[in-house]
């Protein structure tokens, strides 16, 4: 079995590829870098970003690329390129929602931030979230293919961050179907030991 190290800051973050490692039964070192250590660690990463997945000494980066790789490795990808296409498009769509909300929340001008947030609450988020709800409903509580895929792990890993960026602490109450993939992933017995020991600090 390869030596695997997952490098990230001392928080849950989003996407959480570690859940996929746990699902795959992969033993790994969960290396947490404190923020004061980051300037020293940063030059040793592929792109100066976190997270980093290290396999037998070689380092790889980008949350979604890592998740896609692990999904393929552990049987959570499509059975052909069209099924992979379906998974990729929904992952990109969920990430678009995250990115659009985050761009507003990280706006430095407070007044402009509120204007953009109100605009998105009126014109963007309802369409995006309703569409996502429709897709999960169509897929019987999963994000793609009507079965468990790595897209579900990305969605669940991102969900708390998404609620924060959208300013919707009751997001799963507004869209109850969102609870389905969350319950499916978090109740998986393969993840229990990892989830019990995983960082609780959010971001």
From Swiss-Prot:
Keyword line: Transferase
GO MF annotation list: glutathione transferase activity
Induction (UniProt): By dietary chemicals.
Domain GST N-terminal: 1-78
Protein name stated in the entry: Glutathione S-transferase 2
Domain of life: Eukaryota
EC number(s) reported in the record: 2.5.1.18
């Amino acid at each position: 079995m390869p030596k695997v190290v997952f490098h990230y800051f001392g928080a849950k973050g989003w996407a959480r590829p570690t859940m996929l490692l746990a699902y795959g039964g992969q033993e790994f070192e969960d290396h947490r870098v404190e923020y004061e250590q980051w300037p020293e660690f940063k030059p040793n990463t592929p792109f100066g970003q976190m997270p980093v997945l290290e396999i037998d000494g070689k380092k790889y980066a980008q949350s979604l690329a890592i998740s896609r790789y692990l999904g393929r490795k552990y049987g959570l990808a499509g059975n052909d390129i069209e099924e992979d296409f379906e998974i990729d498009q929904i992952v990109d769509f969920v990430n678009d929602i995250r990115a659009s909300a985050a761009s507003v929340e990280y706006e430095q001008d407070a007044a402009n931030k509120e204007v953009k947030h109100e605009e998105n609450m009126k014109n963007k988020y309802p369409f995006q979230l309703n569409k996502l709800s429709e897709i999960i409903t169509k897929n019987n509580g999963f994000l793609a293919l009507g079965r468990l895929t790595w897209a579900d792990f990305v969605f669940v890993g991102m969900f708390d961050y998404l609620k924060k960026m959208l300013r919707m602490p009751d997001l799963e109450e507004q869209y109850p179907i969102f609870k389905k993939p969350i319950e499916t992933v978090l109740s998986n017995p393969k993840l229990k030991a990892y989830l019990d020991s995983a960082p609780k600090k959010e971001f």
